[in-house]
Structure formats: C-alpha cells, structure tokens
Regions:
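Acidic, glycine-rich loop-and-beta core segments that form the ion-binding/anion-interacting portion
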Residues: 63-112
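Glycine-rich anion-binding loops of enzyme active sites
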Residues: 1-83, 225
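Glycine-/charge-enriched secondary-structure boundary and capping motifs
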Residues: 6-21, 37-44, 92-98, 104-115, ...
C-alpha cells in the first residue's frame, strides 16, 4: 500500500545517493499490488546509466608486478551477503536480535551496524582518475575479494594481499565467530571492510592516496601489490 510518508523517505534516500554520485534522478514510478505483497512491505529497484569516451576507458594492458593496490574502506556489509547474515544471526526467527548491542560493535545495535548505508565512491575516484594513471578498479560487492578483484586484473597478474593489512571492522569478525564461517568463505562473500580497490603504478601510489585523503576518503590505504600469477593471493 502506498504510504506517502514512506515514499517520501525512500525518494529522499535515493536523491541523497544521486548527490553523492553526482548524477541526476530522472524518473521513476510507483505501483501498488494489493493481494500480492504484504501491506507493510515494498520492493525497490533502480539503475544508473553511464557513458565514457572511448579514449578514457580504463585499460589494464600496462599492469605489471610491483603496481600498488589501494583500498577504500567500506561502511559495512554494503548490501551484499544478507542471505548469510540473516542465517548467521537467525534474524527471520528472532528479529529482535537486531536491537541487541554486542560488545564488539562499540555501542551500536546489530541492526545499525548491518544497515549502515553503502558508501558511494564516485567523486574521490574521479579525482584520482584526473591526476593518476589508474590501471584497474574493482568494486567489492557480492563475491568478496576472490570474485571481484580479478575482474580488473590483466591476464598473468594476481593481487597479492597480506591478510594482516586488511583493516576489517569488528562486525565481520562477529559474523565469522557467530556463524562459524571459514576465513576463505568470509573473503569470498563479504567486502571485509574494503569497498573498492584501485591499482596504480608504485611511483604514483602516494599521490593517489593524497588525492583520496583530500576528497572524502581519509582512511584509504595500501592494501597489496600486483604480482605474477592469477586471481587473488591472501597470505
């Protein structure tokens, strides 16, 4: 059922996302489906369309061993892996668990930690692209490190990452402990605190970090390096 106040809040959130992404909200529609969905539930879908000049399309052809992988921190689970999240915390059977305050979360409720808005990286990344040779970008969504980082790698190159260098928030450690999830499955499902990675030449890594730090990503850091091989090596 269409509740104007609820619709207004949804559109407000979408509009804020558009501001962060520096794009326009150009349309939309609302349809009511009585009898098909519970009265207090709704389904939201959207998409963006981007255009890039051919000469500006990123190429990984010059990617080589020694290039540096930079991490842009996430704000949380970033809308991915929620089927596993619900299973781990038994949310469907006990929704009140969302109001619990595990010691690991520093005073936040579980619900607050899980529903932290997904960070939008458009503006800081565009600033880096203006001044640095970027050889690859990977958005760490569903599939975690193992499925997303390889998408930007040149054939014959691997991403070598020291697990000790990954700044993983307490929420992920809590999920792993409660759910008894293997380390591999955690890195193959969740972003583990890294929402996006950018690969740049080693000699431009400091400059790229300076740009990120000055444009809304003060906690961006060096995550790993490119080496010979395939896929992702977590060591």
């Amino acid at each position: 059922r269409n509740v104007p106040e609820k619709i207004a809040n949804i559109v407000k959130g979408v509009a804020e996302g558009c501001v962060q992404a520096d794009c326009a909200l150009v349309g939309g529609e609302t349809a009511e489906h009585p009898g098909m969905m519970p009265e207090d539930e709704y389904d939201l879908a959207g998409f963006t369309v981007g255009v890039v000049d051919k000469e500006k399309i990123l190429s990984n052809e010059t990617m080589a061993a020694g290039d540096v992988i930079l991490a842009l921190p996430s704000t949380g689970v970033h809308s991915n892996g929620f089927s596993l999240v619900r299973k781990v915390f038994n949310i469907d059977a006990d929704p009140d668990v969302l109001f619990s305050t595990p010691a690991e979360l520093g005073g936040k409720t579980l619900g607050e930690a899980l529903l932290a808005p997904t960070k939008i990286y458009v503006k800081p990344v565009l600033k880096v692209l203006e001044e640095v040779q970027v050889k690859g970008i990977s958005h760490i969504t569903g599939g975690g490190f193992y499925e997303n980082i390889p998408r930007s790698l040149k054939k014959g190159c691997c991403a070598r990452i020291n697990k000790a260098d990954v700044r993983t928030p307490a929420l992920f450690h809590l999920m792993q402990k409660v759910g008894g999830i293997s380390e591999h499955d955690m890195f193959n499902t969740f972003n583990m605190g890294v929402g996006m990675v950018i690969t740049v030449p080693a000699e431009q890594a400091d400059k790229a970090l300076e740009i990120l730090h000055a444009n809304g990503e003060p906690e961006a850091y060096r995550l790993g390096v490119i080496a010979e091989g395939e896929g992702v090596e977590l060591c």
